[in-house]
Regions:
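Positively charged n-region of N-terminal signal peptides that target proteins for export
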Residues: 1-4
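Extracytosolic ligand-binding ectodomains
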Residues: 6-10, 19-396
Length: 396
């Protein structure tokens, strides 16, 4: 009887001010755009997150073996009109940690909605707008990808290194596209590279002929496309190729995946871009594990998704054994030095050390380390199309 009472008391203490849950129902949400503009990259992201959850459950060490992690998929559609429905799902399922969202707008809606209301930490593997960190007044938002101000700077430096002197730019008319375009443009202008024109692309606009005409008239050695392959990106490249105005494309992270290869292949040889990631032994180790579990590793944010789930699981473990009601502090603790390094496939090791009261430093697939704002420092992989395939050139 005494053990039963203590168990019940723990469950209330564990959740603190968040939400009540029943025994054996530690639930985290994988809130990503399974349909909509990110639907081609999200399945692998979700599978990677589920892989981390599976590792924790298989260990039988999570929360002293008393609980399992239950993960549920929430389709955000990457559409801000869906925010109310997403927040309702989070609340109804008593979710205590969120992996996501994939897109900035819906991430903002969750952060200012259910996350803020219930004190639920969220770790996004792909939302890059710096605005999210500024809106986070309760230290609930983290990301395992890097903010877009760095994306734009790094991509601009690669462009300059390739000797490109004149560039036409097109960008999605959203926070994601605007931030990327702003920082890309500023870095290149400071380096005396000419931006011939900068054209916003309205989401799902039926006819892009005017935008393509403006880009073609301005000209340049290359054209930058900062959107998503399913959301106007494919149509934009196709229209530009048909116009004959450009042969070289500078691509944002959400344009780099198998869909782009399959659709255009050798037609965009020598085009290039970046994705968040590294070529260290950590990511290579993760890729081996992912491939054994039939996860496609060719797209962006795969390692970041695995790491987001792993960090939440490990933070929950530390919270349990330290009787700490602030999960955000545990997220910072397990992800940053000092502590025993934890690499891909070693979640069970991390859980075991935390059970013993030891400090860990989760490195994971992408060398996770959060700054005071919850942003990852991160690195990038330069990708270039050669023989119709995206090839990694170097780490930046």
């Amino acid at each position: 009887m005494r053990k039963k009472i203590l168990s019940i008391l723990f469950l209330f203490c564990f959740i603190g001010n968040q939400t009540e849950i029943q025994a054996n129902e530690i639930t985290i949400g994988i809130a990503l755009g399974f349909t909509g503009p990110t639907e081609s990259i999200v399945p692998s992201m979700a599978s990677s997150a589920e892989l981390a959850v599976s590792e924790a459950n298989s260990s039988k060490i999570f929360l002293n073996g008393k609980e399992k992690v239950n993960s549920i998929k929430i389709d955000t559609k990457c559409d801000t009109s869906n925010i109310k429905s997403v927040n309702k799902t989070i609340n109804e399922n008593n979710i205590i940690g969120i992996i996501g969202a994939a897109c900035p707008g819906i991430s903002e809606g969750i952060l200012l909605g259910s996350a803020n209301e219930k004190n639920i930490p969220m770790i996004s593997p792909s939302a890059t707008t710096p605005l999210l960190s500024m809106l986070d007044e309760k230290n609930l938002f983290f990301r395992t990808t890097t903010p877009s101000n760095r994306d734009g700077e790094v991509l601009a430096k690669i462009t300059k290194d390739k000797g490109i002197k004149r560039i036409a730019v097109s960008f999605q008319d959203t926070n994601y596209g605007k931030e990327l375009e702003k920082n890309f443009k500023k870095t290149l202008t400071d380096s005396n590279v000419e931006i011939t024109v900068s054209v916003p692309i309205k989401i799902n606009k039926t006819d892009l002929s005017n935008e393509v005409s403006v880009l073609a008239a301005a000209g340049g050695d290359a054209v930058a496309i900062f959107t998503e392959i399913e959301q106007d990106g494919e149509r934009l490249i196709k229209s530009i190729l048909d116009s004959g105005a450009f042969e070289k494309f500078i691509l944002s992270d959400r344009m780099i995946n198998e869909s782009t290869e399959k659709e255009f292949g050798k037609l965009i040889n020598n085009s290039f871009g970046i994705i968040s990631g590294s070529n260290t032994k950590n990511i290579n180790s993760f890729y081996k594990i992912a491939k054994k579990n039939n996860i496609n590793t060719s797209g962006p944010f795969i390692g970041e998704s695995y790491d987001a789930a792993a960090v939440i699981v490990l933070a929950l473990q530390e919270k349990y054994f330290k009787s700490n009601n602030n999960l955000s502090k545990n997220i910072m603790s397990v992800s940053n030095s000092p502590g025993t390094k934890i690499y891909p496939g070693e979640i069970a090791k991390g859980l075991k050390l935390l059970k013993k009261g030891k400090k860990i430093d989760y490195e994971g697939a992408t060398n996770v380390e959060f700054n005071v704002n919850g942003d990852a420092f991160g690195t990038f992989l330069e990708k270039e199309v050669s023989k119709g395939k995206f090839r990694t050139r170097q780490q930046r």
